[in-house]
């Protein structure tokens, strides 16, 4: 009887242990079910994540292609701008060379103008000298004429002195002829100087016109240089802006590439996590 009681107690204890173990197993089963449900939810989320990652990857790839195209366009624009700047530099250099040549021609013209002015002043001075000489010769001729008149009067008053008077008259007539020749020579010289003065005046007018045209060309070259300088600065500003924009695009491309790499790493991590989860589920 005692043995039966012990056996029943042992069986009851075994039953209690079995019930406790069953409760524990049931609790473990519930935990396992909850874990399974959670894992299934995570699996569903993970299934959605690759699609989202793929969408993000596609969008990033499209953005990268667009950025590359914009970068190529900006590089072409930068190349064209650099060509335009080089062309403007060549034009400015050519205009500066033309300006230097024009300034040299202007300097030569001013030198010739100075020489012509000096020649005109010299010719005017000679004209005044010859006019003074001509006036002196005319005064001398008037004086000789008066002497001739006096000699004739003396000849009329004194017949006895006719030989002396004739000699004086001859001398006076010779002096008068010399004076007339000098007057004629002076008049001819004056006419020559007047013609020369006219030529010099025409040369001066021509040089003044040339100087005015040269000044106009210089002003035109200066205006062209000013305009080209403004265009050059604008082209340089556009080139600088294009270069900054290209750098900005390059940074954006680098950022997209980094983001793409991060997304790839994230996708690989998610794939590894999914594989591990499936392996754990298969173990259950």
Curated annotation (Swiss-Prot):
Keywords: Allergen, Coiled coil, Muscle protein, Repeat
GO MF annotations in UniProt: protein homodimerization activity
Coiled coil ranges: 1-273
Pfam families: Tropomyosin
Region described as Disordered: spans on this chain: 155-187
GO biological process terms held by the UniProt record: regulation of muscle contraction
PROSITE patterns on file: TROPOMYOSIN
Composition bias type Basic and acidic residues, residue spans: 155-171
Disulfide bridges in this chain: none
Entry comment, domain topic: The molecule is in a coiled coil structure that is formed by 2 polypeptide chains. The sequence exhibits a prominent seven-residues periodicity.
Similarity comment: Belongs to the tropomyosin family.
Functional summary from the UniProt entry: Tropomyosin, in association with the troponin complex, plays a central role in the calcium dependent regulation of muscle contraction.
Description of how the protein assembles with itself and partners: Homodimer.
Protein name (database record): Tropomyosin Lep s 1.0101
Species the sequence originates in: Lepisma saccharinum (Silverfish)
